[in-house]
């Protein structure tokens, strides 16, 4: 046997790789674009994880709120009373800056306004064919405030209400106003405009 053939077998095998093994190579891309690509991928992954966590938290808090509401309602008669008001298309609520809240009840054709201090509540009957806009309601409210006060009468006695009438707050039944308007106005004096 030849001594030179043994030396050839003991040498390390040749390296056939195109570049160093420690570098990630994308053909036709400079180094600064590779770094930018890695940063963008990392940022997108972080954003996806954060959005996923926020959506899971929102879902959990919604389920908790629904569970608490179901436990607080509890009684079947309360559920029957609240069932018609669950339709979202019958009531619209608007916050007018810091001045107050307006509630449109399309099922009962009522519009209610409660100013921010919460000392009284204005209620206006709507016609089914002409529902007033927020601007029209605000103008009518300003006209009502500019008028001198008129004699008071009970709200809801008949269809022919007196404009500017205030209801008596002692022992009144606000069921005809509906849940949304009754909740908004509570025990405040009611003015029909």
From Swiss-Prot:
Residues covered by the BRICHOS domain: 94-193
Keyword annotations: Disulfide bond, Gaseous exchange, Lipoprotein, Palmitate, Secreted, Surface film
Residues passing through the membrane, by range: none
UniProt key word DNA damage: no
Cross-referenced PROSITE patterns: BRICHOS, SURFACT_PALMITOYL
Disulfides per UniProt: 121-185
Gene3D superfamilies listed in its UniProt record: 3.30.390.150
Main location (coarse class): secreted
Localization (cell): Secreted, Extracellular space, Surface film
Propeptide positions: 1-23, 59-193
Gene Ontology biological process terms, A to Z: respiratory gaseous exchange by respiratory system
Region (Disordered): 147-170
GO CC terms in record: cytoplasm; extracellular region
Lipidation (S-palmitoyl cysteine): 28-29
Role noted for this protein: Pulmonary surfactant associated proteins promote alveolar stability by lowering the surface tension at the air-liquid interface in the peripheral air spaces.
PANTHER family xref list: PULMONARY SURFACTANT-ASSOCIATED PROTEIN C
Other observations noted: Pulmonary surfactant consists of 90% lipid and 10% protein. There are 4 surfactant-associated proteins: 2 collagenous, carbohydrate-binding glycoproteins (SP-A and SP-D) and 2 small hydrophobic proteins (SP-B and SP-C).
Protein's UniProt name: Surfactant protein C
Species annotation: Mus musculus
Gene field: Sftpc
